[in-house]
Amino acid sequence: METLKEEEQFRNFDTPLLNTPHHLKEETQIQQKEREQQQQQQQQLQQQLQLQNERENRNHNITEELNKIPSSNNSSNSSSPNPLSISVSSSLGSASSIHLTPQGTIGNYLVIKTIGRGQFGKVKLGYHKKIPNEKVAIKIINKGKLDPETLKMVQREVRIMKLLHHPNIIRLYEVIETSRALYLIMEYAGEGEVMDFMIAHGVLTESQARTFFTQIVSAINYCHSKRAVHRDLKPENLLLDCNRQIKIIDFGLSNVFTPGSYLKTFCGSPTYASPELILRKEYNGPSVDVWSMGVVLFVLVTGYLPFDGDNYVELFQKILAGNYTIPSYLTHECKSLISRMLVVDPDKRATMEEIINHPWLSSTKQIILSTTMTDSLKNLNSCLEQQINVENLLNQSLNNSNNNNINNINNINNTMATMNNSNNNNNNNNNNNNNNNNNNNNNNNNNNNNNNNNNNNNNNNNNNTTTTTNATTTTPITSPIQNRNNEELDQEIIEELVGLGFEREELCNSIRQNKYNDAASTYFLLQGKKLRESQQNQTDNAKKLEKFYSEPLTIPAHVGENSPLIKYKRHHKRSNTVDSPKSTNTPQYRSSNTQQNNHHHQQQQQQQQQQQQQHHHHTQQQNQQQSQQQYNNNNHNKPPTPTIVTTQASTTVNNHISINNNNNNNNNNNNNNNSSTPGSNTVSSTQSSSINSSVNPSPLCLSNAVPVSLREKLREKEATTTNTTTTTTTTTTTTTNTSSNNSSNQSISSISPPTSTSPNLQPFSLASTANNNNNNNNSNNNSNNNNNNNNNNNNSLNSHIQRRATASSLQQQQQMQQASNTRRLRSNSSSVADQSQRQESRKLEDDWVIFEDYSNDGHRDGQPKNYHLQPSSLSSHKKQKSPVHSFLSSFKNILKRSDDKSFNSSSSNNNTNNNNTTTSVSTNNTPRTLEVDHQNSNNNNQQATSSSPNVTSPSSPSQQQQQEPRIVRFVFGVNTTTMKDAPELMQQVLKVVDTFCIPHTKKAPFLIECETEGVRFSIEICRLPRLSVNGLKFKRIGGSSWRYKSICKDLLSQMKLNSH
């Protein structure tokens, strides 16, 4: 009973609480919230105390460990042998002790490892000694390797980075300069490039792309407001920090512009370059960045580039024509924004104001405008307000109110003019006029008032002169000194820095005067760290990050190795392409996707086919031998009939076959032994297989480029075409060999189509004696054509050619041994004009490419830059065109060229084996059709020569390596280009080197090493297959860079690189 009563009392006690008025319930809820807030505050205070204690303990431990390390700025001498224990916080927030071995110390920073390589130096990861877990990026630039022009570019980059303070631009903290190097301490963005992010996640949605693009627009708009232009915007130069914030890097190509003027420096990456850069027109800075932003936005929303091509000619043509397609799945607003930015005419292209006000960015317009006004500008406004208030107080104490108002107006106009970045000269003129008016007005006043007004005017003039001096030296317009009070600075950070050993007054002065020293950099590092921690603790930001990364894609996208952007990644390992080295010991006629497991099985099958072909050749050639001899006896004065070998490959075959008989005395012996061994009138199985591999285009050249369907078709057609091609080639060789009994050294050539434009290369082993051999061969050819019935002359001629061939073969063997260990074999790529080959070849890889700076006349330092292809008809007295103009015009001339240009090449005889004639077949991997010469030998008294070098064994890599220069993929890998043949160009180089009396040694037929004036350098002739030209490459091995450049300029000035 008692328990029941207690329960009733408890219920009665609860009932009034349940029936309490509404306002009483609200009071109780408010009290509960206040209690919860107090508890949270207490927890936060406890956490802050714990963090402070942890920091003090870490600083104490680090200082003890750093005292053991010898303090030195030299990174080589300052590295400690024992590893340094540094507490590094992981991405999950848990602190873990990791043993890091610093490579050295630079100021207050420990250098850990190399994280990248820039245009002018390396970028290393560093840790601050006094701030735990604070990472920085240290860009190290070796001043000894910089010429005056690049040194100016580095200094300009530093000045522009000092000017820019934006949350989406990488920040410069400190500059340390020594006699040897320049150290730039910059902000570290640890999430990597946007390109890596897209390769890992695929195509971005429009909302994700909008967040990235909003930050890019905000940063670029801020740069343009500071009169700075980036000129190298691309996803590789966009980094991400831990809070998914864009950080723009690499201001090495940036410059300052003035409104209404034009820039003349042509730089950037080809796939992101605007049409005015390609056409070498003068341009205004913002339009170039707008075009690059359009390409970046296209890449963000589609996952591939809008302009792409197999080579630079096709790429530039698409850019100049504005030929691109926008996917249909994009919204109308996104399509319109991309189309407005990718306008070929820079005058009609969208401006930054139009981009900010575009409907696609309407939701983020306020973010762009708010982030454009950075802390520096806000502080500048506060400084102006303080100055105006002080001046008003001074003016109130004066008697003459009219003059005071004029001074206030002048001061306001002067300061607002610096904020709006107007012309400095106009501002100075206005200030001088205003000051003169003030002086005239002050003449009517008292002497005291005149003195005060003149002092104010002098102060204004001093402020204006500081800005004009910067403008005259083409430096960015720097903001005035930020007169920050101690109240504006973060007192917690200052107290922490004072505890670390910094003096309060020096610290405040360095921050106020915007100095880039140790004190200011440490302050800004702690400020940035505090801002990042506050952003990470915000729940809204964490939710946004989760939503950003978890947002589903509207279209399927390839990621990882299957991403279409993987080939544009600068550090990605390149796959085997047409220009990559390949071994030619194995038979070249195989499919492009053959695996290594089936390699030996294919070799066995080919050997069986070759053995079957040998028996077929013997029986067929014995039947044809008598008929061919009768035909040649009756028609020995007529030129050989043209034979055209066609195959069913996917590309057109343009190989040239030249057949030389060295011994006519051995014909009888060889004819008697036809039943047992193949003689001069037959071709061995190895030779027929080599002809087959040379006539058909090597599918190895199309590796990783031919689609799967084309590869399957090629594999199916290989089995059907092997037998037909070998029989046709053997019949052609027998006809020519039998006809050459009376006239040796006859060649079969055909009319080359206008698509075959690669210049002819002479045999590599006879480069030193090319002139003598050419003259002797031409005279021998003329004498043989005029005296076909004279056997004595033929015997003497053949013996002379045989002796020369054996001598050249000995020279080739010696050079093979020297060059086989140091040089690599590279196969030729297809011609620029071959349409079918271009469709099957691999797409152009966009490495970071920097064009050269040109003046109005296309020269730099008085030296012409022939980086691109120039037309052969260009004469010396004509005005020199720009490299890109000549590059495009020469491509048009190549397509229209027919038989105007004579292809001269020297046919050299090779060594003989067992007194048998050898068949020399051109083995250029570039496919060609057989040239047929219909000219009559009686009228012209001259035989047409083949336009490709003669190679004894096409399957041997060492000999093919010797007879062709090294392949260079891109134009910027050489110093200059020319249409001359490689042997002729080598003779020109040797002639110029001899005129300057420079001692040199010939390391290879197309490579020499020179040493003079304490400078050692090499000169190499390279091959540019994409442009069908030869390049000249200079490389400094040792010595002073100044003397090396002067020597190279002298040598290039004396070389005649234009083809005649």
UniProtKB/Swiss-Prot annotation:
Catalytic activity, as annotated: L-seryl-[protein] + ATP = O-phospho-L-seryl-[protein] + ADP + H(+); L-threonyl-[protein] + ATP = O-phospho-L-threonyl-[protein] + ADP + H(+)
UBA domain mapped to chain residues: 488-528
PROSITE patterns: KA1, PROTEIN_KINASE_ATP, PROTEIN_KINASE_DOM, UBA
Domain Protein kinase residues, every copy: 109-361
Gene Ontology molecular function terms on file: ATP binding; protein serine kinase activity; protein serine/threonine kinase activity
EC number: 2.7.11.1
Family statement: Belongs to the protein kinase superfamily. CAMK Ser/Thr protein kinase family. SNF1 subfamily.
Protein name in UniProt: Probable serine/threonine-protein kinase MARK-A
